[in-house]
Amino acid sequence: MKLIFDVSDKPKAGQLVVFALQQMLAILAATIAVPLIIGNGLTPAAAMFGAGVGTIVYILFTKRKSPVFLGSSFAFLGSMAAAFAGGVSMQLGMLGLIVGAFLAGLVYVVIAIVVKFVGVGWLNKLMPAVVIGPTVAIIGLSLAGNAIGDLVKGDVTKQVTEYAVSTDSGTPEIIETVSNVPVGSSYVALICGLITLAVVMLCSTYGKKTLRLIPFIIGILAGYAAAAIFTVIGNICDIGALKIVDFSVFSSYMLTDGSVSLKTFVSLPDFAFVSGLKGLKEFDFTYFATIFVAYVPVALVVFAEHVADHKNLSSIIDHDLLEEPGLTRTLLGDGVGSIAGALFGGCPNTTYGESVACVAITGNASVITIFAAAIGCMLFSFITPLVAFVDSIPACVMGGVCIALYGFIAVSGLKMIQDANLDDNKNLFVVSVILIAGIGGLTLTFGDITLTEVAAALILGILTNVMLSKKKGNAAKK
């Protein structure tokens, strides 16, 4: 595709700051979601810092030739939860996260060494475009439910208590369940999300050069402004349906001890290694085995997603990243970057499809933009009001952004198979299996290890391709 800024281009200083901010906004929602889901002492600020560190390591390993941001990996959510299973202390759990990320990164390093000696020819045969294309599409389509779920949801919540009768113990018992439900109307949230999406699309399609480069910033600001106006009116008139933005996050971040202090403006993130070092005395072989089993198999599957992301990015920038800088370097960058990032944030990192989509939609593939975004994430993590602002962006606004991002990932995957001959039954079956398995939500669970629909669909696609290729070869011989 036609790029406004190529990989080696350097935007002007003012532009660079704005472009970097846009990349940050594209990846931050998912990056901070992982620590919020896991809890146990993990914080969004530390995850932001770790993502920045991991991205810089990746850029250095790839010789500044691959424009993609590394963020917290959702594939390892089950693995991370296993690190805290069994009632272990927070300190031991943090150490487990770091050890797990090291093991996952080590898997990448080992594969990189193998690729260094045997090349990538085998990989292209195992995962041709007819396999990678629909897999990339599934990466986007599998996130569609998240985008739509967020699109109709505000962030202001209230506690609701529900009662149910349980007979599990043999005698009827009343079970009390407390949950947080949105106060705002789903229709008001939908309006804010659609305003965001509309502004993104209009800026990207009809905007002049500058607007076309920053559609997500303009879209998020427009959606946030609309949501804030609704919320202010809702607070003044006491109309719960209009309350979308949760402004209380500013006080929870900035007034931690109930008063204004230095932490109101600047604070040190809770780095994982600080707590992890305190867990060394509890670490034993049994716990190591638990972490090994939880992380290593998942890393093997995520490797395939790594290849898919880089083939997708290669098609966007019109340069084969698996050849130059080479799969060895991208794997080393991803693996070592993930280890470095987890030391600070606790979360293994991975190349982000949102970042790739941002590159494609804006036409800005400048690596210096990604580098600046990484530095920005690290700086943001220390500035309390900025962390609070990012956390206050309503789900519906990010849902509008994600429709564009996830949709573009899906479409770019489908574009990768446009040259494949789908009149050939072999190719038709490979694509069909991957799409239906992925969209259908096929997951495979082995103990504490869960293979996502993307991983399961990719594995089925590879097996189908290998099986039918062999059959076709045998038929040709006969």
Where in this protein do the model-derived segments appear?
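Short, Lys/Arg-rich, polar N-terminal cytosolic tail immediately upstream
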Residues: 1-13
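Membrane-embedded helical hairpins/re-entrant loop segments and their flanking transmembrane helices
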Residues: 11-13, 37-57, 294-367
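Hydrophobic, membrane-embedded alpha-helices of multi-pass small-molecule transporters
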Residues: 14-30, 184-197, 214, 261-309, ...
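Early transmembrane hairpin of solute transport permeases
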Residues: 15-193, 382-385, 392, 396, ...
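Hydrophobic core segments of alpha-helical transmembrane domains in multi-pass membrane transport
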Residues: 19-27, 32-35, 50-59, 79-83, ...
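Flexible hinge motifs at transmembrane-helix junctions and intramembrane kinks/re-entrant loops
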Residues: 40-43, 185, 199-273, 293-308, ...
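Inter-helical loop and helix-membrane interface segments of multi-pass membrane transporters/permeases
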Residues: 82-95, 121, 141-208, 236-282, ...
